[in-house]
Amino acid sequence: MDTQVLEILFWFCCFLVFYAYLGYGILLYGLLSIKRLLTTKNTAPADLPDQSLPAVTFVVAAYNEEDWIEDKIRNCLDFDYPKDKIQYLFVTDGSNDQTPQRIRQYPLPKGVNLRLYHEDARRGKIAAVERIMAFVETPIVIYTDANTMVSKAAIRKIVRHYQNEKVGAVAGEKRIAMSDKDAANSAGEGIYWKYESALKRWDSEFYSVVGAAGELFSIRTELFEAVPQDTIIEDFVMTLGIAQKGYVVRYEPEAYAVESSSASVQEELKRKIRIAAGGLQAIARLRPLLNVFRYGWLSFQYISHRVLRWTLAPVALPLILLLNIALALQGLALYQILLALQLAFYLAAIAGYLLEKKQIKLKALFIPYYFCVMNYAVYRGFGRITRGRQSVMWERAKRAA
């Protein structure tokens, strides 16, 4: 193949990867800076006084969370929000440990409205949430996981966005708790979520967040629509579906859910494979959102922030290496240097993997390792989704103590 053609393909693939992971963030920040210059209006919503706060339903989906559930209840009871305006719904379908019993036996303070819904059959989180939506009696519903601790002011910060009738959903922030013991394991995961949080803040301010994480998000109850029972990442599909209707999804960094890091990168891989499979499934089911002429900025954000990471970027990575080898073999000095840098990066990732297996913690090597794991997960996810082997049931990753 002609050298010039190889060079064009090489740099095009480099651009895809760069844009998917860094370039979009740079471009978005630039566009946002221009918007700020042209707009003098303060877009930050004001907190509501107690008498104006809306009633909310706080939904906690739990499956075999006996180790966490009492902490979760205490966390809920500590919210800075009028108790007479919160309805707590705990759903524990399929749990066969002590989770339902511990909820029933928990000594609740007077005036707390907490209900437990339990079925022995396990049909997945989507089915459980859909079942209890019939019992929601408030205009706003907030969803969270049982093993995450939510910030005290979260509800108050979330509901202020609904003063704007165009807001259909609000995404909270996910934070990774790091201790000295698991600092190396969680380095890649923590940095990834910090960067994701920054992108979501900019997405929200520019136009709309493209999908929410299930650790903490909320919607207008009237906008709830059941998603197909085999949906893998229902939180993402649910909130993007609301955006597809013409509403915007806001991001609230002061409403955050704290979760322990995965016990190892290999444990995190389980989550990444499931999310990748779910992302590919979502792309197929949300095909209309790929039409930039119909959905404008929403499509631009969706393709740039999500679609490229789940499709073209992982494919481009091995092509970059192969094209780089071909160009370096032609004696081109620039490509020989770039090949050396690529090989050093992948060797660092392999070293991170080997050190993790030996329980040796070295944070610098976990970042390239984590990046490679993220992209490897897309291939595994693609294999699962095409073979129909990705279960809708959540496979819990072991968390650091």
Predicted regions located by residue number:
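N-terminal membrane-anchoring/stem segments of glycan-assembly enzymes
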Residues: M1-L48
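Short aromatic/hydrophobic "clamp" motif used to bind/position activated sugar donors
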Residues: V141
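Short, acidic, metal-binding catalytic loop of nucleotide-sugar glycosyltransferases
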Residues: R74-K85
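A conserved acidic beta->alpha catalytic loop
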Residues: N75, T92-Q101, A121, T148
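Long helical/loop segments within the catalytic core of UDP-sugar-dependent glycosyltransferases
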Residues: L32, G111, Y117-H118, I126-A128, ...
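Acidic helix N-cap motif at the loop->helix transition within catalytic regions
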Residues: W68-D71, K85, D97-Q105, L116, ...
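Membrane-embedded multi-pass helical conduit in multi-pass membrane proteins
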Residues: T3, I34-K35, L48-D50, E259, ...
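Catalytic donor/gating beta->alpha subdomain of glycosyltransferases that bind UDP-sugars
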Residues: Y162-Y195, D230-E234, T239-H305, Y370-R384
